[in-house]
Amino acid sequence: TERVVKSTEELIEHSEINVKQEEALKLAAWFHDIGYTKGHENHEASSVKIAESFLEENNATQELIDLVSKYIMATKFSHTPQDIGEMIIKDADSSHFAKEYYEETSELLRQELQLHNRKNYSSSEWIMENIKMLTEKHKFYTDYALKNWNQAKEENLLELVEKQNKREKKLNKEEHKARLKAKYKNDNPERSIQTLFRVTLRNHIKLSDIADTKANILLSVNAIIIS
């Protein structure tokens, strides 16, 4: 939440909006994820209810309440922002895609999904899911984010792609070794037969050498006796 608040303030500083929009955006940033305390499903709507209740208790105007609610609902992932305010809160909410700590944040999300039995991704599956997210599902909307955050997002994407490529190369190498091992041990009876013949021949030669040695000894003994 603090990250979203800071990102919202950064975007506000570089955008042309009025005081009411600024106040509503900051409040929306603080309240946008509080609905998780009520559950994961449709948490944005739960966040709106909590924010509305708080603002009403503190005598906020209906105009401000409506604007805060509108901005909170704009953080819903499937929502396409319709104005500058929604663009700001949307970009702020996804600013972690452009942060140096993106990988750590992503891993925490994977663990959270596992903890709540929502989805269990392997490391490789999670990397691919993140690559898909950054290439197909996410985009920044404000001019400031496009100019200042998009490059960092692309660098994070590149790191993910490189990591996945290394994993695939390692798996392919291990798979190749396993295939060769299986080929020569199990899938090549001809080689096994050849090995058997070689061992048999070697044993036969050893036995012949032993027999020849014994024969030479007997001949020597007989020669001594005769003499």
Q: For the regions a protein language model found, what residue spans apply to each?
A:
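Divalent metal-dependent phosphate-bond-processing catalytic cores, especially two-metal-ion Mg2+/Mn2+ enzymes
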Residues: 2, 6-19, 31, 60, ...
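Alpha-helical transmembrane segments and their immediate juxtamembrane boundary regions
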Residues: 206-227
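Residue-level marker of motif borders
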Residues: 27-28, 88, 207
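Juxtamembrane loop-transmembrane helix junctions in multi-pass integral membrane proteins
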Residues: 84, 193, 200, 207-210
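Short, charged/polar, low-complexity loop and linker segments
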Residues: 182-202
